[in-house]
């Protein structure tokens, strides 16, 4: 959809997203002729995960390539999280804990964390794994979140903020903090 001209057109794409429970197409960002999409991906045997793909913008066809896949895949249609934000050369993403609770405290698994990668999918060398958190997966920026469905770069202080759905009304809003644990 072109919001100026009100014209619409269909674009072919190779994105294989799965509509399951709370999953499907989860977020999209456009910058410098690229699109990043977070989505729920079928990983086989009834298991799904939050994935991020990138494509060069074309009016005819989008050839998406996965640049991140949350592991492990889980047999659940809940809490994909999956919002995206770009700050400079970094792409931040939220990964919900998929309804698995304590998995958010395990830095060797992606669910329940904030992810930080470069916009091309490569891993920043100043992520927590390389600065004293050697047991953390290299893409993880922060752990201990439940179902973060908001993620944004503040124009006021240039920080990344997230909103997190808590259980039974325990929603909260806070800053994404490198190497920290929000405690879910």
Can you describe what each PLM-predicted range is?
Residues 23-25, 97-184:
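Beta-propeller domain segments
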Residues 1-102, 150-166:
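Acidic, Gly/Ser/Thr-rich repeat motifs that build Ca2+-stabilized beta-propeller blades
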């Amino acid at each position: 959809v072109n919001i100026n001209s009100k014209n619409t057109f269909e674009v072919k794409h190779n994105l294989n997203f799965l509509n399951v429970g709370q999953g499907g197409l989860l977020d999209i960002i456009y910058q410098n002729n690229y699109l990043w999409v977070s989505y729920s991906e079928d990983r086989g045997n009834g298991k799904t995960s939050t994935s991020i793909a990138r494509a060069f913008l074309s009016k005819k066809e989008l050839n998406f390539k996965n640049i991140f896949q949350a592991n492990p895949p889980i047999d659940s249609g809940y809490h994909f999280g999956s919002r995206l934000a770009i700050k400079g050369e970094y792409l931040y993403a939220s990964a919900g804990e998929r309804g698995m609770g304590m998995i958010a405290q395990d830095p060797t698994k992606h669910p329940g964390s904030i992810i930080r990668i470069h916009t091309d999918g490569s891993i920043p060398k100043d992520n927590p794994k390389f600065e004293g958190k050697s047991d953390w997966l290299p893409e993880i920026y922060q752990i201990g979140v439940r179902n973060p469905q908001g993620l944004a770069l503040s124009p006021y202080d240039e920080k990344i903020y997230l909103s997190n759905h808590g259980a039974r009304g325990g929603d909260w809003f806070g800053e994404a903090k490198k190497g920290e644990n929000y405690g879910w």
